[in-house]
């Protein structure tokens, strides 16, 4: 029990920038490794399967991102409510909130698996996926969504740990399973010649292992954030609080992802080479947003704990500090990605047409950045 307590972090006192950075850095590294799941899939199929397979994986990115961002929205809701009770020192409600979060998570796993599997081909047709990559894209998504339970359990479980200030253990699990994903990708593709199905199976196996490790921490601990499978129940009052925070965040993420699906439908019109090039650069570009997402998660926990402790002024100061820190980090990373786009794209493929398409996308991205700075 003593060991478990050392993993929590009280953010209601101490240097605000230092606390935010200490909390955000493990999150940032963890987000990088979580994003590597799909990125590594693209690198492996691009180098060892072919351009059409790379285009198939790339064309599914917007759909898989939509599911990830939607789950993250609900995770934010749970983190805010649990963090508020942690900051207030209300251990009874905190424990109840954890039980409600996990009970709702198991129900969501069933609902979302059924929804995404049934809507799989519809989403690909909606994006006007070309016939020569449709079959492989559909296969990849079916396998991915059959194992989406692992993703949801990990995200919600790590959200509970983040609420009490523990970002290290979710990071450890994610690093280990990301390395495992790379190894399984190579084994399934090079040794067993499973093609695009191999990288999909590798991804869901790794996600289930990270989910199992996170669930084991929550079930086996004796600390205030523990839960027992036999004691799970839904507290409708707490669930309403979680949904009031999490649902708007989830909907906002889905709207953004859905707009990207419209863009993808136009890109698909130009064929596999353009699809692969744009898809590869978009995977690289996503890393620009990781510091913002990580700092937002850190700020969410910081604000929740301080509001719970009735330190509203400190909560406001934390919000301002997180914005300033995010802008500085994003500026540096964006510059590096734009300058070295060609080198980064060559990690995915040696196809010059794909690389040229990706470089064109990076130049347009530079213009977008300049416009935003001027505005």
Stretches with model-predicted labels:
Residues 1-22, 203, 212-256:
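Interhelical loop/hinge segments that connect adjacent transmembrane helices in multipass membrane
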Residues 18-79, 83, 247-267:
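Signature of the first transmembrane helix
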Residues 24, 58-61, 105, 141-144, ...:
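Residue-level recognition of transmembrane alpha-helices
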Residues 32, 36-55, 124-131, 187-194, ...:
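Helix-terminus/linker motif at the lipid-water interface of multi-pass membrane proteins
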Residues 54-114, 151-170, 278-341, 367, ...:
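Small-residue-rich hydrophobic transmembrane alpha-helices
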Residues 111-138, 142, 332-359:
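Short membrane-interface helical motifs at transmembrane helix boundaries
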Residues 131-154, 286, 292, 352-367, ...:
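Alpha-helical transmembrane segments of multi-pass membrane proteins
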Residues 178-212, 341, 356:
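Membrane-interface helix-loop junctions in multi-pass transport and translocation proteins
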């Amino acid at each position: 029990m003593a060991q478990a307590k050392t993993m929590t972090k009280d953010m209601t006192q101490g240097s605000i920038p230092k606390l935010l950075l200490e909390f955000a850095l493990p999150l940032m590294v963890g987000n990088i490794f979580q994003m590597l799941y799909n990125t590594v899939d693209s690198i492996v199929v691009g180098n060892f399967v072919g351009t059409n397979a790379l285009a198939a994986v790339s064309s599914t990115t917007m759909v898989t991102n939509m599911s990830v961002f939607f789950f993250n929205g609900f995770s934010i809701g749970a983190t805010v409510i649990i963090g508020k009770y942690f900051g207030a020192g209300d251990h009874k409600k905190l424990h109840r909130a954890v039980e409600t979060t996990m009970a709702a998570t198991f129900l969501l796993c069933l609902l979302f698996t059924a929804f995404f599997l049934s809507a799989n081909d519809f989403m690909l047709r909606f994006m006007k996926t070309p016939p020569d990559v449709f079959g492989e894209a559909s296969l990849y998504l079916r396998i991915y969504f059959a194992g989406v339970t692992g993703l949801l359990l990990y995200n919600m479980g790590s959200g509970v740990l983040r609420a009490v200030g523990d970002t290290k253990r979710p990071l450890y699990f994610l690093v280990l399973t990301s390395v495992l994903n790379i190894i399984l990708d190579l084994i399934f593709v090079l040794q067993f010649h499973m093609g695009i199905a191999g990288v999909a199976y590798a991804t869901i196996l790794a996600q289930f292992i990270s989910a199992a490790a996170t669930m084991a921490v929550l079930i086996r601990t004796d600390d205030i954030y523990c839960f027992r499978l036999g004691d799970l129940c839904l507290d409708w009052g707490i669930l309403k609080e979680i949904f009031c925070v999490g649902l708007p965040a989830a909907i906002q993420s889905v709207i953004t992802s859905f707009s990207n699906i419209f863009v993808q439908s136009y890109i698909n019109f130009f064929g596999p080479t353009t699809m692969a090039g744009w898809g590869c650069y978009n995977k690289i570009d996503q890393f620009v947003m990781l510091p913002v997402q990580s700092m937002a998660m850190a700020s969410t926990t910081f604000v929740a704990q301080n509001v719970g402790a009735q330190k509203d002024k400190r909560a406001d100061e934390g919000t301002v500090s997180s914005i300033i820190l995010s802008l500085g980090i994003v500026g540096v990373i964006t510059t590096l990605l734009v300058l070295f786009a060609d080198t980064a794209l060559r990690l995915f493929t040696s196809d010059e047409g794909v690389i040229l398409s990706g470089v064109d996308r990076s130049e347009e991205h530079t213009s977008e950045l300049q416009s935003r700075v001027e505005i």
